[in-house]
Every structure is written in C-alpha cells, then in structure tokens.
Amino acid sequence: TINYNPQRTRFRKQHRGRMKGISYRGNNICFGRYALQALEPAWITSRQIEAGRRAMSRNVRRGGQIWVRIFPDKPVTVRPTETRMGSGKGFPEYWVAVVKPGKILYEMGGVPENIARKAISIASSKMPIRTQFIISG
C-alpha cells in the first residue's frame, strides 16, 4: 500500500478554494500506454484513490504496471458532531487531491488493451466523477 498522507506540510489547515477551469498540468500520458482521465472537477479522497488502485491491480495481476498520477495534498477539516458554530476551524480529518477536468488519475502499461479497458472501467466506478479511457499515441 502507498502512504497517501504528506510527510510534512507547511501549514496544518488550508482554505477550501475553488476548482475553476481545466487542468493544464498532468494531462498527458507520461508513463504507461493507457490512462484514466477526469472529465469533471472534484476532490478525490485518499481512500478513493487507494480503492481504485487496488481494483486495477487486482484485475491486471502480474505483468501490468500501474502509476497513480494524483496525490492527496490538501487537508480537509471536520468539526466534531453536535458542536456549535464558531470557536475556530475544525481539525484535519482526511486528505484530498484536487482534480480538475483533463487531469490523468491512473496510468497503466504492459497489458493488452481489453484487459486495461476492463481494469480501468472498474477503477472509474470507484471515482466520484465521470472519467474517460484514453490511449497514448
């Protein structure tokens, strides 16, 4: 398993920000032959990333290689239940990756196209957004 929390960050809490526009970086296939590309903006949690990676690796078995192209580096804070408003921001609860349209989530290589298509479609069903399967070249 991959550790999906940053080792150390400069600040413990972040603003939520907003996801405008499209992804200009990380939208080309760099490592593999097939890839899963996001079509919508979203926050993708570290658990969702890991679930997608596991689903893919279970499908390709040996021979295939998988690259995860996103990393959750944004802390999301949650305040305790039944707490009144005010008294500061909540505590960091989990990490998310900010994904914009066009961003490549996973890449895969070393397997035939039909197996890659099947594995990536299973991984895409774990994602909270619409995605598309793309082939390099």
From Swiss-Prot:
Organism: Vigna unguiculata (Cowpea)
KW Plastid (keyword) present: yes
tRNA-binding recorded as keyword: no
Pfam families noted in UniProt: Ribosomal_L16
The gene coding this protein: rpl16
UniProt xrefs under InterPro entries: Ribosomal_uL16, Ribosomal_uL16_bact-type, Ribosomal_uL16_CS, Ribosomal_uL16_dom, Ribosomal_uL16_sf
Keyword terms, alphabetized: Chloroplast, Plastid, Ribonucleoprotein, Ribosomal protein
Name assigned to this protein: Large ribosomal subunit protein uL16c
GO cellular component: chloroplast; mitochondrial large ribosomal subunit
Family the UniProt entry places it in: Belongs to the universal ribosomal protein uL16 family.
Subcellular location: Plastid, Chloroplast
